[in-house]
């Protein structure tokens, strides 16, 4: 790769040295940076949230295409340098913050798109965090190829897991292209890929189901080799009879394992358990409630 295809790096651009403790690997290939910006399909009016702008290589492109740009940078030194760099840009805000502590929707204060070269050691937490409504209209991430493979994995495969299911319940994930290690400074030791996540027009879940669904899925994949009967007994503190009734209501065999269930099947389990709880509550109310016996003692 010739030098003219790369952005300035390190001290030559006046930036502080790379901090390995923050998992910093700066993308320097201008062609790939351009492809990432293209993948956002910006029209010039959008609010763009950029996670981890680093030295501003992608930011330089986005400021010319976005209506408003909010860059979230954890590294204090980089955040200050970026503020100075874009001080004359009225459409740019540099937010010095931990992205996991920020409500993305509140920060955007309206519709937004999301992009980021996220630190690989916290990629999964960031992806989960970005699923919290109000979600981006579309998101483009530079991630480990392993994560990209997990996002598109099929049930029953090794890569299939909680991340796969939670994203698929509300959005479509697609791998756009891979990125060689030589496109970064310093080069990472893993393969990378660019993925785009777009909300589904008709998601599997209604908003009030999303949090209990996420807890169910993450809990289940913590026991991915256990039978679903055992999973429900552990997660919901119910006996085998109730667990089997719930699974029967979802048309799932009690012996099935979490790693074989589709996102739609997890949604059925959640609703079957909710229906079972509502029926039990109704039965208790019809019988006068458990407190009557206690009151008579």
Regions from the PLM with identified roles:
Residues 233-235:
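Short helix-coil junctions and helix-kink-helix linkers
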Residues 1-219, 248-252, 259, 268-275, ...:
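Catalytic cores of RNA-modifying enzymes
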């Amino acid at each position: 790769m010739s030098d003219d295809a790369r952005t300035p790096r390190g001290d030559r651009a006046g930036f502080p040295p790379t901090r390995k403790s923050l998992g910093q690997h700066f993308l320097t290939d201008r062609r790939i940076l351009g492809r990432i910006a293209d993948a956002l399909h910006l029209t010039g009016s959008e609010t763009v949230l950029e996670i981890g702008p680093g030295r501003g290589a992608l930011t330089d492109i986005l400021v010319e295409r976005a209506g408003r740009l909010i860059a979230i940078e954890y590294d204090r030194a980089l955040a200050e340098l970026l503020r100075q760099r874009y001080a004359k840009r009225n459409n740019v805000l540099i937010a010095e913050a931990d992205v996991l502590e920020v409500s993305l929707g509140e920060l955007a204060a309206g519709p937004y798109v999301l992009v980021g070269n996220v630190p690989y050691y916290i990629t999964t937490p960031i992806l989960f965090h970005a699923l919290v409504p109000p979600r981006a209209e579309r998101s483009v991430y530079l991630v480990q190829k392993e994560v990209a493979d997990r996002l598109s994995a099929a049930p029953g495969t090794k890569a299939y897991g909680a991340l796969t299911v939670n994203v698929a319940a509300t959005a479509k994930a697609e791998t756009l292209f891979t990125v060689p290690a030589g496109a970064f400074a310093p080069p990472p030791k893993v393969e990378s890929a660019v993925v785009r996540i777009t909300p589904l027009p008709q998601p599997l879940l209604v908003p009030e189901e999303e949090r209990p669904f996420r807890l169910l899925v993450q809990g289940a994949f913590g026991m991915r080799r256990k039978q679903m009967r055992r999973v429900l007994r552990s997660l919901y503190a119910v006996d085998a009879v109730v667990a089997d009734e719930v699974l029967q209501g979802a048309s799932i065999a009690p012996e099935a394992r979490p790693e074989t269930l589709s996102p739609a099947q997890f949604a059925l389990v959640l609703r079957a358990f909710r229906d079972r709880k509502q029926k039990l509550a109704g039965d208790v109310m019809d019988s006068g409630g458990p407190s009557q016996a206690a009151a008579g003692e």
